[in-house]
Regions:
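Conserved S-adenosyl-L-methionine
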Residues: 71-139
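Short conserved micro-motifs at the rims of enzyme active sites and ligand-binding pockets
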Residues: 48-51, 125, 165-168
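Conserved beta-strand scaffold positions in the cores of enzyme catalytic domains, especially
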Residues: 37, 112-114, 156
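SAM-dependent methyltransferase catalytic region
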Residues: 129-168
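Intrinsically disordered, low-complexity boundary segments flanking structured domains
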Residues: 19-28, 101-102, 136-147
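Class I S-adenosyl-L-methionine
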Residues: 1-84
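Residues at the C-termini of beta-strands that transition into short coil/loop
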Residues: 41-42, 116, 160
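Charged, often flexible domain-edge or linker segments that flank or initiate folded functional domains
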Residues: 1-2, 6-11, 110-111, 115-118, ...
Length: 168
């Protein structure tokens, strides 16, 4: 028994000699549809992501940040306003930054959980510090004041591994 809404619609390509494709209608996906071409003018690039870190920190303390605009685009397509987003490879904290920006933009209440192993103190020195500054506001190296995204909070939990003889 198929109980996940209306049956999906399919069509044949190349007059029946190609493949089968699924037809997606906007009303069935909440008016949002993903495309397979995302130009960097809309989603950013790594150079932009590094410049964003420089605006926040004065330098780029992380080698491979993701563009905030890219993650905002992903979340806009894949979440609703009350989703919980989980990132097990938190890196520089772009996921939380993008979540807070999108919430401010569309009035959402998305929650974001970041997890990292704190290799080279990245969580303490980059991930946490970045998002603390984004929430509280900061001054760029050029002296510009950036207003904080004050309607957010940030909690930091430290965990540890149990030795094998103590685990269940």
């Amino acid at each position: 028994v198929y109980d996940k809404g209306p049956w999906p619609r399919f069509y044949f390509t190349n007059k029946g000699k190609g493949g089968i494709r699924r037809k997606v209608y906007l009303d069935s996906v909440g008016g949002r549809i993903a495309t397979n071409y995302w130009p960097y003018e809309e989603t950013g690039h790594t150079d932009e992501a590094k410049k964003e870190l420089i605006r926040i920190f004065g330098d780029a303390p992380f080698d491979t940040p993701k563009p905030t605009r890219l993650l905002r685009r992903v979340f806009d397509l894949s979440t609703n306003k009350d989703s919980t987003i989980l990132d097990f490879f938190a890196g520089s904290g772009t996921t939380l930054h993008a979540t807070m920006q999108l919430n401010a933009e569309d009035g959402g209440h998305r929650k974001c959980i970041l997890v990292t192993n704190n290799e080279n103190n990245i969580c303490e020195e980059v991930t946490y510090e970045r998002n603390k500054r984004v929430i509280q506001g900061y001054t760029t190296p050029k002296g510009e004041k950036v207003e904080g995204l004050h309607d957010n909070n940030l909690r930091y939990y430290r965990t540890n591994f149990l030795s094998r003889d103590k685990s269940v």
